[in-house]
Design a protein with these regions (language model features):
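Rossmann-like NAD(P) dinucleotide-binding subdomain of oxidoreductase/dehydrogenase enzymes
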Residues: 1-120, 248
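ALDH superfamily catalytic-core signature
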Residues: 43, 84-229, 247, 251-252, ...
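Glycine-rich nucleotide-phosphate-binding loops and adjacent flexible coil segments
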Residues: 241
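Short acidic/histidine- and often glycine-rich active-site loop of Leloir-type glycosyltransferases
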Residues: 33-37, 136, 237, 257
Length: 267
């Protein structure tokens, strides 16, 4: 749901170039994007005298998705979403000896060395953590900071978070928009609770915003938590604006921490 048009575009365009047709099952959380793109495709197809059926859409929840994963006429399934979803899709498609392309979760970190330009680093870490309200597989989840500069980074970042403006993402003055739905909000709240129960120290408090402009109940405050890399909650991706801070002393230790999670990494 976070990049609904882009995900469709980079998958379907390649398939068309190779002479294949596509059936697109959009996220049930962003179905109108699929309809809008299909309308554009229909115009292009009509202008170029292309037959119907090259691009098709179906909308619905996971039960509709199961129709695709189990259909032996569909030789390749490309799926973007959670790691949990990927395990199900990959196994189901493999049962019929089909092929799957899976773009799943990420648990990305930034390693901050003593030589780093902290002003540039803070901007990058801030955008990486709160951009799209933390709802990207490429979002920054962890900051691995050298012990010599840990306090300085912590203080500068906490100060920067206090300047964030939360609201309608169509307003260019705002930095952070909403989470996708109430389920995502509950996951966000449970993640904070879990981090604290494991020993985490909350530096920048979270919470759900209320009042004018926040009637949906999906606008939340970005959070910073001091944590350890081995915490269960840190080891698993949370699709929300929660950033974990941790220390290192030697670069080899930092690299081990960076790689020491189950999900993939972006750079």
């Amino acid at each position: 749901f976070n990049f609904p048009v882009a995900v469709w575009n980079w998958n379907s365009a390649l398939a068309w170039i190779c002479g294949d047709t596509c059936v697109w099952k959009a996220s049930e959380k962003a179905p109108l994007c699929a309809i809008a793109c299909q309308n554009i495709w229909n115009e292009v197809a009509n202008e170029n005298n292309l037959p119907e059926g090259i691009s098709c859409i179906i909308n619905g929840d996971y039960r509709v998705g199961e129709l695709i994963t189990k259909d032996e006429r569909i030789s390749l399934v490309s799926a973007t979403g959670s790691t949990r979803m990927g395990r199900i899709v990959g196994a189901e498609v493999a049962k019929r000896f089909g092929k799957s392309l899976l773009e799943l979760g990420g648990n990305n970190a930034i390693i901050i060395t003593p030589e780093a330009d902290l002003d540039v680093t803070i901007i990058g870490a801030l955008f990486g953590a709160v951009g799209t309200c933390g709802q990207r597989c490429t979002s920054t989840r962890r900051l691995i900071i050298h012990e010599k500069i840990y306090e300085e980074v912590k203080n500068k970042l906490s100060s920067a978070y206090k300047q964030l403006k939360i609201g309608n993402p169509l307003d260019e003055k705002n930095h952070v928009g909403p989470l996708i739905d109430k389920d995502a909000v509950n996951t966000y709240l449970k993640a904070i609770e879990k981090a604290v129960s494991e020993g985490g120290n909350v530096l920048v408090e979270g919470g759900v915003l209320t009042g004018e402009g926040f009637e949906s109940g999906c606008y939340v405050k970005p959070v910073i938590i001091e944590a350890e890399n081995y915490y269960e909650i840190v080891q698993d991706e949370t699709f929300a604006p929660i950033l974990y801070l941790m220390k290192y002393s030697e670069i080899e230790e930092a690299i081990d921490m960076q790689n020491g999670v189950k999900q993939g990494l972006s750079s």
